[in-house]
Amino acid sequence: MAHGVPFDHNYYIVECKEETNAEAQAGAMAATSTEEAPGAVEVAQAAVASSHDSGGAIGCATVKESESDSESESDSESESDSSDSSDESDDDSSTSDEDTSDPEEAAAPSVAAVAAAAAPPTVPAAAAIQIPGPYRYRPPRRHVRRRRRGPPFHFAQWQVEEMESLFEETQYPDLLTRGELARTLNVPEVKVKVWFTNRRAKQRKIERREMLRNIPPGAEDFIFITDFEEPS
């Protein structure tokens, strides 16, 4: 014989009531914190009242509906807040980009200008190849005054005879003798000195010629004649 299992219905109803009361209070607190769903409080209160009258099943359904409504409202609010914040961030970023891009682009030099400034100056090939050669010392030019040769000085016949008579006496007259003769002939003393020098050279040539005439043939190769002039 099957015996029925005893079941305490009152215990189940009490537990449902406690659960519905706790869920209703949580939904009411969420609705008051958001302050944008005033109907949620009324729904929670109605759910509490109906739970006392109709039992735990209905109370659970109403609480679930209030939770779904509050979740949908909170999701919509979070989406709206996120969209507003994203729009504001986009606007701020766009304005900051516009503010920062213009002065930077205006202040930044162009790539061509930077490359032209960094490039070294071009040097012609001819100037780069030139190599200085060895230094050659060039002595300064000396301006030598050339003596102008005037017309040759010619003595008169009587002047030559006076100098020839003195030459027969001495071939090397001293300075005083040449000075007296120059005053007598009315000529510079230098001219008298030059005439005596030339006359001695002429006399040596005459003497050498006479000596060579008197030498026998074949002996000329062994004779060395030195022509020198004694100092005056």
Curated annotation (Swiss-Prot):
Keyword annotations from UniProtKB, A to Z: DNA-binding, Homeobox, Nucleus, Transcription, Transcription regulation
InterPro entries assigned: HD (IPR001356), Homeobox_CS (IPR017970), Homeodomain-like_sf (IPR009057), Paired_Homeobox_TFs (IPR050649)
DNA-binding region per UniProt: 148-207
Composition-biased stretches (Acidic residues): 68-105
Database matches in Pfam families: Homeodomain (PF00046)
A GO molecular-function descriptor: DNA binding
Region ranges (Disordered): 45-114
UniProt-listed PROSITE patterns: HOMEOBOX_1 (PS00027), HOMEOBOX_2 (PS50071)
Subcellular location as annotated: Nucleus
Major site of localization recorded for this protein: nucleus
GO biological process terms held by the UniProt record: cellular response to retinoic acid
CDD domains assigned: homeodomain
Record-level GO cellular component terms: nucleus
Described purpose of this protein according to its UniProt entry: Probable transcription factor.
Family that this chain belongs to: Belongs to the paired-like homeobox family.
Protein name: Homeobox protein Rhox13
Protein source organism: Mus musculus
Gene for this chain: Rhox13
